Amino acid sequence: MAGASDRTGVRRPRKAKKDPNAPKRALSSYMFFAKEKRVEIIAENPEIAKDVAAIGKMIGAAWNALSDEEKKPYERMSDEDRVRYEREKAEYAQRKV
């Protein structure tokens, strides 16, 4: 069987399914920026709405062009979301016990 598969015969352990009630992880400052910027980019360029790679490159370039001062609001959102996540994670752990 030429080119059949790369398998070595070693079984990998199955990944445990995530509990749908578990809290969502905190977003990074970049992710808050990307959510906001993606909407702007698609509104300005509807023809590239399906080109995820191009949009990602544009978002990355825009993020890198921001000064530290311009990134502060997104860092603040990230800090607030991290606090939310830690609180929800603690509540979730209490419910599981």
From Swiss-Prot:
The keyword Metal-binding does not apply. Residues 23-93 bind DNA. GO terms for cellular component: nucleus. It is found in: Nucleus. SUPFAM superfamilies: HMG-box. Keywords: DNA-binding, Nucleus. Gene3D superfamilies: High mobility group box domain. InterPro entries: HMG_box_dom, HMG_box_dom_sf, HMGB. Pfam families: HMG_box (PF00505). GO terms for molecular function: DNA binding. SMART domains: HMG. Residues 1-24 are annotated as: Disordered. The keyword Metal-binding does not apply. Its main location: nucleus. PANTHER family: HIGH MOBILITY GROUP PROTEIN DSP1, MITOCHONDRIAL TRANSCRIPTION FACTOR A, ISOFORM B. This is High mobility group protein homolog NHP1. It comes from Babesia bovis.
